[in-house]
Amino acid sequence: MPNPLRQLLRPRSAADFTAQLVATGEVKTALDIGCGTRSHLSQFRPSVQTTGLDAHADAIDLAKQRGVHDHYIQADILSDNLDATFDLVTLFGLIEHLPKASGLDLLDRVERLSAKFILLETPHSFVPQGPEFGNEFQRHHSGWFINEFEGRGYTVHGTTGTRYLRGYMAGPRYNFPGCLLLDEALTLLLRINRKPKHAFNLVAIKDVRGVPARHKKEAQP
């Protein structure tokens, strides 16, 4: 049984930040880019119509078998043009697998696909990773920083523990008993959700509609 105090103190995850956007009531359609065979968006169905996009047919087929999404698109987001927009577009653990120039192109494309919100999660700075599970696409090719997202109008939060005690694939950086327990304590002490400079992962969120007018909403005469 989960410890209630631990649950209360638990820092928010990428899934929590996604739920926060859905809770606004403004998200009726959502696109998960690089969806693979599972998705954080599934929990919001049926109130949110979800679409999974992946370049790999095997991933799409397995996602269909599992009933992960309402709709599916097999496409390469960097080369195929999509004639659709969505209230929310998510990218979980995707952009770091691309070279930097391709990642910047991806952000440009994603910002055209979203009518309201974008949410992405990626490691903070470059974190080496090889072709895990025999999949060359699991290799990391770029690292991303807070100022790169903030410069594009994103709000950035931290997740997944601290960058000081987390390492390869977010596992313990050091081989001593209790490393991850110590990381949990340090995560709370450093308040990584609000201070992403300490975090292992970054969650970047953007409202593509920009900041609404606060004073003069009517056109000038």
Each model region followed by its residue ranges:
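Conserved N-terminal segment of class I S-adenosyl-L-methionine
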Residues: M1-T90, L104-L107, R139, T160, ...
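Acceptor-substrate binding/catalytic loop of class I
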Residues: Q129-N147
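A SAM-dependent methyltransferase catalytic signature shared across enzymes that methylate proteins
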Residues: F145-T162
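Conserved beta-strand signature within the Rossmann-like core of class I S-adenosyl-L-methionine
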Residues: A115-P123
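A short glycine-rich, Lys/Arg-flanked "PGG" loop and its adjoining helix->strand segment in the class I
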Residues: L104-K116
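A short SAM/SAH-binding and catalytic strip from SAM-dependent methyltransferases
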Residues: T90-A101
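Internal alpha/beta domain cores that form substrate/cofactor-binding pockets in large enzymes
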Residues: P46-V48, Q129-G134, Y154
